[in-house]
């Protein structure tokens, strides 16, 4: 049976610049506990400004169940509900909601790179950045999932999220560990061409000159998460 990497990005904070570590801990603990019983490896992979991304390595037949459980947990612990309330069972009523990206796993361990963006006044140009990352992955033959869409996206087990969702997520699955540094370097280098975009550590708040966008890049490896910021910084010495 095919397996997939599913990433769900959401703002459940009560502010626009950072997340609550205690809430993150509660969400992560319950998601891991409930999904592990189904044989699904899941965790918070990215924390970018006021957004978190929950990433799962999940069999095709459990995608709907995976998403439903994550949505339940988010509603249980959320301090801010705007993104959650943007979800609708009616496609035409879906508003700014979750960011949803899915890509087929080509590794038995579910290895992938997850890139998450957060905006502060950069809503008008952030989609271009995410689509650029998507294009890099596809150009080099990787399977890519991207949350950017011109129309509402159906999230199995949850409902529809609107096209105006503005903190995109990109998932790129890889076959070999050696693909990680090559792909991460290409993404980092390519994104340098964008003005008002800042590469930050996983977990960083929005500490920029607005308007602008921040992004994090992590490796999701067999359910474990590695922040790629430190490795890229040491290699490139920026």
Curated annotation (Swiss-Prot):
To M.thermoautotrophicum MTH564. This is Uncharacterized protein MJ1676. It comes from Methanocaldococcus jannaschii (strain ATCC 43067 / DSM 2661 / JAL-1 / JCM 10045 / NBRC 100440). The lineage of its organism: Archaea, Methanobacteriati, Methanobacteriota, Methanomada group, Methanococci.
């Amino acid at each position: 049976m095919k397996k997939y990497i599913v990433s769900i990005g959401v703002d459940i904070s009560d502010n626009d610049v950072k997340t609550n570590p205690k809430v993150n801990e509660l969400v992560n603990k319950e998601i891991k506990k409930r999904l592990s019983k189904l044989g699904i490896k899941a965790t918070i992979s990215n924390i970018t400004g006021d957004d978190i991304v929950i990433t799962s390595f999940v069999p095709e037949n459990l995608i709907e169940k995976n998403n439903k459980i994550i949505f339940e947990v988010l509603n249980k612990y959320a301090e801010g509900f705007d993104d959650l309330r943007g979800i609708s069972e009616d496609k035409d009523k879906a508003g700014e909601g979750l960011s949803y990206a899915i890509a087929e796993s080509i590794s038995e361990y579910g290895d992938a790179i997850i890139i998450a963006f957060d905006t502060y006044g950069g809503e008008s140009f952030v989609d271009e950045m995410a689509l650029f990352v998507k294009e890099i992955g596809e150009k080099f033959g990787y399977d890519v999932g991207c949350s950017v869409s011109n129309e509402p996206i159906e999230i199995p087990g949850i409902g529809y999220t609107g096209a105006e969702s503005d903190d995109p997520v990109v998932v790129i699955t890889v076959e070999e560990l050696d693909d990680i540094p090559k792909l991460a370097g290409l993404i980092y280098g390519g994104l340098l061409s964008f003005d008002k975009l800042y590469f930050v550590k996983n977990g960083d708040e929005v500490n920029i000159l607005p308007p602008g966008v921040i992004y994090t890049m992590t490796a999701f490896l067999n359910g474990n998460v590695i922040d790629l910021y430190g490795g890229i910084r040491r290699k490139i010495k920026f």
